[in-house]
């Protein structure tokens, strides 16, 4: 088990995903400083907007880049590395959450079945039209169900709680079929 700082957000990322963040609270500025100094990461857990609580399953992320922004805030770019489950946690005096987590195994690699390839093509078209959704120079795996389901979940305008459900699903193909149902339900709107 690992102890990691937790950054509760009203946003979600998956392993392999990129996310820009603007840091301004002292506890998180200190967290970022320590992560950069120690070459470690932190956890992103989705807030559930009830009692300032957050989900136990989240994504462990590493900081790729940081910069002082024009408005004085710290800008960082993170990349999701692996999912975790919080076993227990403590809240430090500065309100930073430190959690003891179990890193979760990712499902086995699975190619996308032929009947789901149109959803991979859908993702490819989105990323060609809107490259800001994913780093231009990052590798793209349009035939791999885990990568496609993760990127689709990150960019689709789904309810955050529904994205969390996808993050918690252990099987990449089940994730992709769930996303297929979501996309198909929106085609006639």
Give the positions of each predicted feature.
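N-terminal low-complexity, acidic/polar interaction/targeting segments
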Residues: 1-189
């Amino acid at each position: 088990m690992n102890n990691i700082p937790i950054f509760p957000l009203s946003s979600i990322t998956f392993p392999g995903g990129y996310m820009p963040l603007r840091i301004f609270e002292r506890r998180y500025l200190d967290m970022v400083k320590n992560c950069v100094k120690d070459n470690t990461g932190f956890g992103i857990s989705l807030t559930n907007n009830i009692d300032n609580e957050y989900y136990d399953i989240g994504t462990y992320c590493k900081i790729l880049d940081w910069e002082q922004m024009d408005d004085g805030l710290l800008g960082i770019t993170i990349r999701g590395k692996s999912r975790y489950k919080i076993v227990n946690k403590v809240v430090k005096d500065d309100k930073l959450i430190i959690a003891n987590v179990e890193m979760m195994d990712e499902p086995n690699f699975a190619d996308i079945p032929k009947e789901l390839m149109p959803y991979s093509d859908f993702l490819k078209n989105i990323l060609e039209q809107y490259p800001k959704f994913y780093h231009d120079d990052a590798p793209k795996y349009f035939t791999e169900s885990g990568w496609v389901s993760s990127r689709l979940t990150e960019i689709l305008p789904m309810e955050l709680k529904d994205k969390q459900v996808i993050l918690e699903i252990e099987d990449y193909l089940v994730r992709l079929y769930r996303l297929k149902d979501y996309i198909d339900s929106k085609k006639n709107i």
